[in-house]
Amino acid sequence: MGKGNGSDEVLVVCSDRNMGTGIAIWDMETGDRIVHIPTCASPLHGLLCLRDQFLVASQVNKHGSVGGGAIFTWALNKPQQPLRSYPLEAIGPLGCTKDGLFLAGGSPSGNVYLWEVADGRLLKTWRAHSKSLKCLSFSKDDYLLISGSEDGVVCVWSMVSLLDTENFESSCSLLHYSSEHTSSVTGLLTTSGIANSTFISSSLDATCKAWDVVSGRLIQTQDYPLGITAIVTDLAEQLLFAGGVDGSIFVSVLDIGLLEDPFAVAGDEPVVLKGHNGSITALTFSSVGLISASEDCTVCLWDVISKVIIRRFSHHKGAVTNLVVIPRSASNHRRVSNQFRVSVLNKCPQPANSSNGILTLLHTCSSPEDHQAPVDFKRTNSLDQQIFEMEVSFSLI
């Protein structure tokens, strides 16, 4: 850990300062900028990579601006001209399934949108939270979508229910929710754990919480001396790294298998990595080691064993809001065989208007606060078959 062949990977970074800053792809070995993609300013959790072939980024919506949001998509083998989508509402955090078939976006209003990537079809939109969405993450098996909001609420949604656009009488897709956090959720991290059934949330309330995703049970809370702004595990999921508002990065040994105490710290004092002068904005992990970004406009590559910075990158055009590690081969502009297909994402439809006979086919769910009790989650025997059939049908498009 902390030692590896970094030549096989490159680092994608972006800022939210202005559209001219764009996206940079850096060589982690030398610090050289390999590619610059113009016209991008993405908020926290607003950048992701689809199947190592496309970069997708939501765009910041400045105060006072008129109109909805924007989501741009770039093919990595021809990254200069983006595919531009303009939903009617600003989109902040993004999440995608591992196969790249489905994309979710969260809005400041608390709505979540679910698109099918291949043809851009909007599959579902619903009021997920009463406050602004801050994080979205799919479970390791893609059966569940997890969302976190500004008021500390964490929700778990059934993808099978969300994808069932024909059953308009079905109950809401919410499996369970929690308001255990007392401040904004800043990170959602799914882990392999036991049967892919655990995830970790971080918050400005100075805690990280481990959850059983099936039952919604809070397994354990880890307290910190200050607010946590970003989380990540190492590749083996043995260590949890939690970035703080003062630039510190706290390191804990993570063992989800020990349900009574999944967070463990070796020694009397927690390990703290110090190298930033501003709040941590993003964390990710590569074969070389931990990568951190901060409001001090620097990105650091760490050897976590020796607790030292291997390399420091300066991003003079603003604080980095997103870090994504991709294979080097994805950024070398090669023509991709059997390239995955993406389309312009459909605009969000207007609400149904009974006076003019317009009916929206999108099922809308109420926010978690409207539910008196969480819905019990039981995995059905048909779940795998439903997902499989959908993936087959989309792959044939």
Regions found by a protein language model. Give the residues of each.
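A structural motif specific to WD40 beta-propellers
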Residues: 32-35, 80-83, 121-124, 165, ...
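WD40/WD-repeat beta-propeller blade N-cap
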Residues: 38-44, 85-91, 127-133, 171, ...
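Conserved strand-to-loop turn within each blade of WD40 beta-propeller repeats
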Residues: 16-19, 58-62, 66-67, 106-109, ...
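Loop/turn segments within WD40 beta-propeller blades
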Residues: 2-9, 48-53, 94-100, 130, ...
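Short loop/turn segments immediately following beta-strands, especially the blade-tip
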Residues: 158-167, 253-262
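WD40-repeat beta-propellers
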Residues: 23-26, 69-74, 112-115, 154-159, ...
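Terminal intrinsically disordered, low-complexity extensions flanking WD-repeat/beta-propeller proteins
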Residues: 268-272, 279, 305-397
